[in-house]
Amino acid sequence: MNENLFTSFITPTMMGLPIVILVIVFPAMLYPSPNRLINNRLISIQQWLVQLILKQMLLIHNSKGRTWALMLISLILFIGSTNLLGLVPYTFTPTTQLSMNLGMAIPLWAGAVITGFRHKAKASLAHFLPQGTPITLIPMLVVIETISLFIQPMALAIRLTANITAGHLLMHLIGGAVLALTSISPAAATITFIILLLLTILEFAVALIQAYVFTLLVSLYLHDNT
């Protein structure tokens, strides 16, 4: 029986319970205690990458905006690791679910907007009406800016969902083509398999890039409101 193309996007369960519970609990059991942590090259590289990412994201922030550094680095590590784990065979990618991405995007966006209205109410309201706008265009621009503000979290979530889903579907289709061509034309199957390997490497890059883009946009929303 042929497998449904979207089967990989269905939350896997075991005995009626979501397997994601095991995914969350099992790594926590293996997490090393502070006395087991050691300084080695891998940890040094990880610290260097974290510092580099934070430096790039916090360049535009003032001292108040830099208090969000821990949240931003936690967000990019969570999304990046989730995207990479989704590339492992027989696993599930939570970021292909629009509901999860909206669950991340809406609270982060709402927190940034509420922070802006609490600390910079006049500046936040000024975004709805650019300076020098003709009087006749004021009502229309206010409506347009309001709509664009509320579209931001949806665009943030849909961008991540679409990019991750498209890559997984393409890998699924090419992988099926490799299996179908194996018995028909080994040469064509070999070429298609090479394309699949290149696409897999590209998906690793996309997984990290999309995590960076998502977090960078959240950082920009915070910058506009702090």
Swiss-Prot record:
Subcellular location as annotated: Mitochondrion inner membrane
Reactions this protein catalyses: H(+)(in) = H(+)(out)
Keyword Transcription regulation: no
Record field: transmembrane: 9-29, 68-88, 97-117, 138-158, 164-184, 201-223
Gene Ontology biological-process entries: proton motive force-driven ATP synthesis; proton transmembrane transport
A Pfam family matched in the record: ATP-synt_A
Database matches in Gene3D superfamilies: ATP synthase, F0 complex, subunit A
Keyword list, A-Z: ATP synthesis, CF(0), Hydrogen ion transport, Ion transport, Membrane, Mitochondrion, Mitochondrion inner membrane, Transmembrane, Transmembrane helix, Transport
GO molecular function: proton channel activity; proton-transporting ATP synthase activity, rotational mechanism
Cellular component terms per the entry's GO annotation: mitochondrial inner membrane; proton-transporting ATP synthase complex
Domain of life: Eukaryota
Entry keyword DNA-binding: no
Membrane topology: Multi-pass membrane protein
Function of the protein: Subunit a, of the mitochondrial membrane ATP synthase complex (F(1)F(0) ATP synthase or Complex V) that produces ATP from ADP in the presence of a proton gradient across the membrane which is generated by electron transport complexes of the respiratory chain. ATP synthase complex consist of a soluble F(1) head domain - the catalytic core - and a membrane F(1) domain - the membrane proton channel. These two domains are linked by a central stalk rotating inside the F(1) region and a stationary peripheral stalk.
PANTHER family assigned: ATP SYNTHASE SUBUNIT A
Designated name of the protein: ATP synthase F(0) complex subunit a
